[in-house]
Amino acid sequence: MCRHQPRARLSPDEQLAAEESFALYCKPVELYNIIQRRSIKNPAFLQRCLLYKIHARRKKRSLITISLSGGTNKELRAQNIFPLYVLLARPTNNVSLEGHSPIYRFSRACLLTSFHEFGNKDYTEATFVIPDVKNLATSRACSLNIILISCGRAEQTFDDNNCSGNHVEGSTLQKLEGKCFWGKIPIDLLASSLGNCVSLSLGHTVEMSSTVEMTPSFLEPKFLEDDSCLTFCSQKVDATGSFQLQVSISAQEAGAKDMSESPYSVYSYNDVPPSSLTHIIRLRSGNVLFNYKYYNNTMQKTEVTEDFSCPFCLVPCGSFKGLGCHLNASHDLFHYEFWISEECQAVNVSLKTDSWRTELLAEGVDPRHQTFSYRSRFKKRKRVEISSDKIRHVHPHIVDSGSPEDAQAGSEDDYVQRENGSSVAHASVDPANSLHGSNLSAPTVLQFGKTRKLSVERADPRNRQLLQKRQFFHSHRAQPMALEQVFSDRDSEDEVDDDIADFEDRRMLDDFVDVTKDEKLIMHMWNSFVRKQRVLADGHIPWACEAFSQFHGQELVQNPALLWCWRFFMVKLWNHSLLDARAMNACNTILEGYLNGSSDPKKN
């Protein structure tokens, strides 16, 4: 059932915009319909196993309390009735032998020792939980019976160790073999009396009484030890001496306490005629209003569902709380606001455009041409953990790339094997004097540790034959490569001409029209630096910024505009969590050293 909110006076353009705004609900709803159709054949989980579904079923059960009143049983003496055992049992079959009752299997037994006006409450009431009386006729519980057993021996004692409250273990009933009086109250008869009771649906307690015919019989507990079963034989005792017992029965819904806490459940039905009360309660039970907001939340359309059902997939959720769990877990493309009052239970639904904007396709666009993200589960590898004490004093080391032999020798000397088998660089600081001078001087490379490479001799001969059949081209020059170049240890990707790279970088930056000259210069300096120093990962950014501040510090302090561009760039890196406060402070300390004219800025 859907209801439109009366529209205000809108112009034709505004009405068209409002309709387009409401049409945005169609895409997510269509997606949920597709998911729902697929889940029918291959469900991801069973609805009945959800925790809020289980709680909802438990709240719909009925709580039955059995007690005896001394006022209605004045003709009977207490010593002839008590102790009275009350059992909730089900017949194992409908076939019974002559003179025998059906064999009953019980799940719970309670003990009453006095009338409910006297004595301890634990031993004056027997409480059982049965399914909802509305669904009792179609469930297995329709064959349940409340069985009352009186041995008529007041002097009989019972073991407290076998009693928990008024709950009695089966070992105690094994001692009751012999003459007794017994009677039963069929649950289906009780359900027929409670089914038309309106007060029970409102969470109130219903009081009623029942007359039970207690007939003499002989209790045979031969099945108690194994199956918790018992039967009664009427041939072994005199059939005379039966009596009637007035039993007080109170019933209420198991979730009545939780219902009384809800404002929606305390609605007053005083003005409702008794003839329409049942119909009104049925209509109000489980009804939820969904208000769909659109057109900047200025307009809405209302839909009503029954039995706490979801409006998108029509799944009954059992309770208002369960409905909230279902909507937030299964339909998170919308934003929900839940509110409840004495008049209604409602949910305000609005679009959460940011969460599904990238998932929906534009009009007329082929889905096969859309970019999608894929995450592969790589095999987890054991990482070698290096303690912070071992890497605390590591600093970036910049060397001249003009002598690759020296760089390789320095790399072998600066890396040593620690006790845990991991390679850690020694603390080495390049003199500040080597960083002064021209900013675009001879190319420099960052010192790295030894890298293990796969030699040609260790390669698979079959792979070598396959490589010989293909033609390879240089990564930068796009010229055919000889086999010797293909199988060499050098990678053509690493053969970068710094002069050409700087020229291409400057030409690319010159095409920018919305940046200043100083911004172009700082971008070119940074691009050139990270290329020559091989800054390859996000974790390299902190030491790269320190090295950049030290390498270009003299030029930065001579140009205040360029210095501010560099500091603004560091703030950008900090906003993206690529640069921490410690590294930024170290960079500013280095720059302040150059401003103060210090010969070694890193000491300041």
From Swiss-Prot:
Record region (VEFS-box): 454-589
Changes seen on gene knockout: Dwarf phenotype with early flowering under long day (LD) conditions. Defect in floret development.
Zn finger residue spans: C2H2-type: 310-331
Key words of the record: Chromatin regulator, Developmental protein, Differentiation, Flowering, Metal-binding, Transcription, Transcription regulation, Zinc, Zinc-finger
InterPro entries: EMF2-like_DUF7651 (IPR056068), Polycomb_protein_VEFS-Box (IPR019135)
PROSITE patterns: ZINC_FINGER_C2H2_1
Residue segments, region Disordered: 396-440
Pfam family, any one: Zn_SUZ12
Gene Ontology molecular-function annotations: chromatin DNA binding; zinc ion binding
Function of the molecule: Polycomb group (PcG) protein. PcG proteins act by forming multiprotein complexes, which are required to maintain the transcriptionally repressive state of homeotic genes throughout development. PcG proteins are not required to initiate repression, but to maintain it during later stages of development. They act via the methylation of histones, rendering chromatin heritably changed in its expressibility. Polycomb group (PcG) protein involved in the repression of flowering under long day (LD) conditions. Regulates floret development.
Homology family: Belongs to the VEFS (VRN2-EMF2-FIS2-SU(Z)12) family.
Oligomeric and partner information: Component of the polycomb repressive complex 2 (PRC2), composed of the core PRC2 components FIE2, EZ1 and CLF. PRC2 methylates 'Lys-27' residues of histone H3 (H3K27me3), leading to transcriptional repression of the affected target gene.
Family matches, as PANTHER family: POLYCOMB GROUP PROTEIN, POLYCOMB PROTEIN SUZ12
Record's protein name: Polycomb group protein EMF2B
